[in-house]
């Protein structure tokens, strides 16, 4: 009887341990997967500052190009494409968080005018779905459906990102008007150099925090270095920690200055931003334009016919 109780207790403890481990794994995985792509969402209410600068540039310090292509004009309640291109050399490899080299990822933020939003799945054509691929877009905030974010996604497959956009209808949204609107875009390739809390990633250059002589360089077991810098005047020692990834540029016994680079800059990526304009066109205006063009064409035709008729009359009078 005692043995059965003991076995039951052990079984219960094992079940609890497995359940706890599973819960920790799920929570950790969810936290990482949801937080990793969109650092900006955690610290900024709006991704575009009053100066026009997109906040992604605070972490991705290198300046790189980005391009956006949208139609010149769209009709109300219409699905259209906003194509964002993030060009880079596909042969490049970036430093990963563990210090190893890997392929670059890309990400983008698209800031649309108020009223414009991500198109519903049932409104997207099969051809557009094929161009979109397996991308999953999300709003920057539940209340900001006009700001869309994506990433990180594999750069080799998605250096060109197609956003399916639904234009608003002023007939149902009174705060939307038939006007020309700006669209802003930001796109990055590769990892950032600074985390949202201000700390450095391993994808940037590390500088000396003091001047002096490099006394000792210890290579860590998991990668990276501990560099001891000794001040020549008072013997004070400072230890600079270098994470795995950047290549060391100094050696023991070398004299260095304050803020001198201790490592190379491994960053091969960067961030860029751009803008475009789109006109929300009034269908009545389009119909009016078509009517005007048709009137001009008909007037030209009647003018030609009248001219030919006049020439025939003149010719008959001359023959008479």
UniProtKB/Swiss-Prot annotation:
Its main location: plastid. GO terms for biological process: photosynthesis. GO terms for cellular component: chloroplast thylakoid membrane. The chain crosses the membrane at residues 286-306. Binds 1 heme group covalently. The keyword Electron transport applies. It holds the Pfam family Apocytochr_F_N. It is found in: Plastid, Chloroplast thylakoid membrane. Keywords: Chloroplast, Electron transport, Heme, Iron, Membrane, Metal-binding, Photosynthesis, Plastid, Signal, Thylakoid, Transmembrane, Transmembrane helix, Transport. It is a single-pass membrane protein. The 4 large subunits of the cytochrome b6-f complex are cytochrome b6, subunit IV (17 kDa polypeptide, petD), cytochrome f and the Rieske protein, while the 4 small subunits are PetG, PetL, PetM and PetN. The complex functions as a dimer. This is Cytochrome f. It comes from Panax ginseng (Korean ginseng).
């Amino acid at each position: 009887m005692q043995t059965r109780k003991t076995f039951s207790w052990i079984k219960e403890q094992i079940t609890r341990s497995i359940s706890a481990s599973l819960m920790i794994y799920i929570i950790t995985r969810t936290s990482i997967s949801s937080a990793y792509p969109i650092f900006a969402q955690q610290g900024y209410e709006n991704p575009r500052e009053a100066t026009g600068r997109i906040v992604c540039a605070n972490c991705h310090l290198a300046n790189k190009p980005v391009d956006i292509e949208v139609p010149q004009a769209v009709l109300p309640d219409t699905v259209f494409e906003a194509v964002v291109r993030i060009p880079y050399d596909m042969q490049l490899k970036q430093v990963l968080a563990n210090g190893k080299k890997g392929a670059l990822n890309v990400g983008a933020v698209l800031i649309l005018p108020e009223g414009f939003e991500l198109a519903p799945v049932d409104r997207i054509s099969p051809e557009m779905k094929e161009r979109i691929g397996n991308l999953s877009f999300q709003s920057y905030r539940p209340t900001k459906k006009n700001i869309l974010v994506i990433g990180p996604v594999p750069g080799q497959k998605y250096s060109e990102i197609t956003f399916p956009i639904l234009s608003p209808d002023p007939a149902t949204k009174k705060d939307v008007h038939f006007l020309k609107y700006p669209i802003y875009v930001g796109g990055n390739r590769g990892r950032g150099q600074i985390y949202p809390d201000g700390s450095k990633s391993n994808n940037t250059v590390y500088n000396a925090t003091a001047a002096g002589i490099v006394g000792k360089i210890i290579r860590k077991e998991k990668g990276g270095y501990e560099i001891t810098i000794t001040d020549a005047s008072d013997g004070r020692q400072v230890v600079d920690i270098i994470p795995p990834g950047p290549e060391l540029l100094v050696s023991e016994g070398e004299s260095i200055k304050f803020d001198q680079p201790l490592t190379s800059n491994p960053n091969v990526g960067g961030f860029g931003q751009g803008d475009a304009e789109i006109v929300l066109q009034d269908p009545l205006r389009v119909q009016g334009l078509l009517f005007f063009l048709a009137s001009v064409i008909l007037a030209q035709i009647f003018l030609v016919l009248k001219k030919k008729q006049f020439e025939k009359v003149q010719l008959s009078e001359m023959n008479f």
